[in-house]
Amino acid sequence: MNEKTVKQEKELSAARDTFASTLFNEGARMEKERVLNALPEEFARLHRSGAFHIHDLDGWNLVNNCSTPLPEYVLHPEHLRTKTPGGRIAELVEQFKEMICTVQHRQSGGVGSCNFDREMAEALVAAGVEPTAENATAFGEQATLLFTWLSTQRLRYARENFYVTLNMGLDTSSWGRIVTHESIAAFAALPVDYTRPNLVFKVKGEINGRAGSPNYDLFLAACDCTTRKMIPTYLLMDAEPNRACDPFKINIMGCRTRVYANRNGEAGSVGRGNIAALSLNLPRIALETKELEKFFKLLKARMNAAKRVLLLRAEAIRKSPFAAEMAESGVWSAKNVEEMCRQGTYSIGFIGLAETVEILGGGKVQSDPRARELARRILEVMRETTDGYADETGLNFSLLASAGEGISGRFPKMDAELFPDAECWKKGFYTNSFHVPVDSGVGVFEKLAYEGPFHRFANGGSISYVELREAPIGNPECVADIVLDATSQGVPYLGINYPLDICNVCGTRGTFDACPHCGSKNVKRIRRVSGYLETLDEFSVGKKAEERNRLANSGNHRE
């Protein structure tokens, strides 16, 4: 694929308002209305009014959210047709690509690979491909083609890139190390606006997190790539919420989804996924009550409504031929849709905890100990409640620290209509999950120290970000320091952000309003939204407002 072809394909697939995408959008809008009209009036009203948000309504009675396919579904070294090592490598990567297409069109959310390094390594060994320097180069070339395809082709709903998350870093075999090294190197070498897939580097002290450990060099390579492209993000296996997990059985799906504990089978992420999710508007509950006792009473009522919605959805999915096809295809360890619904997770999420605490008179969470204690108590009650639902139903209910990409702007807009005198909505967005407000300006380590203890409540998935003033290019030690501190603070999953601007005229990169080299204001701005990187013009209204308010977490990280 030559440079001209790549550019043409990227320009063609970047046009979101195509016939196919327009047709899909209209169909999705109509399906959402149909679902809401069919729901019990109480639940439809809560969604329409912005009291909570039912995610992926257009797939209500059709498909699950996200999954991590079984390795044997993805790669089939026994079916390779070519005899040369390079041909076999290319075929295996093509099989992986075919899996992405198939699974992404069978569900509403992202697809993950739990151990991309180990799974690909085992397939390469089974295919008889030796871990030579020549074959390592061949794999790197195929990784480059795969990542280019994921970054440039908007094949999801004819308008979006596929949501793919590759977890890696723990395999110490020859091929496992090659897969990790070449994947990171391939991603680092691609243009900075090539932002797919999301690479997640698993950090485990004795394997790669300490000097002298077998894969420490790969950890440093990952840190160096992060200084240039904000990817990889880091799954911290020695952090308190992950410590009891088998590091080879847990991974991130999508931008933060965590699937591990299992009441109805073996614990782990592989061959499982999230069935459905719903997010609560916490500030709305505070605005409606203004007093703690009433707040907790209404919180439990809203969570109970959320539970009933998710149970209705599970019942609808049990009757879906599309869900049955997914269950019976070998993607999941479940053999039928009933077992799939028992093995999967049901997540109740939330956004706006910082605003909620302030409405209730607790002050600023980043500076007031009373506010932090109230935030902790709210999370504790929510986790106790979801655990109670799991006990009651026998299903895997969990608490999700929602990203809130779409709802971060939707919720405050609707609250403004109901509470025009409230201050919380005036900035145009609500803060992600339990995060420190983006305009707090607290230091890196202070932010991690505040958010760290809250992660243990969010067993359905969570992430902490730190926002640097600029890309720490050439300083991977900066990233390593932050990763190690986040681990000690109990952060299970970490992302490192910074503004990344690219001049569309001359290619200069940095942080600027106008290009310092040629003066052009034709600038592409790449930022992290939720878990994935996007160009700023693709952000939702709420996330654009959030980005305008972001301040760097400066003052206490190594420059």
Predicted features and spans:
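Glycine-centered flexibility sites
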Residues: 349-352, 460, 531, 542
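Conserved catalytic cores of very large enzyme subunits
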Residues: 2-342, 363, 368-525, 534, ...
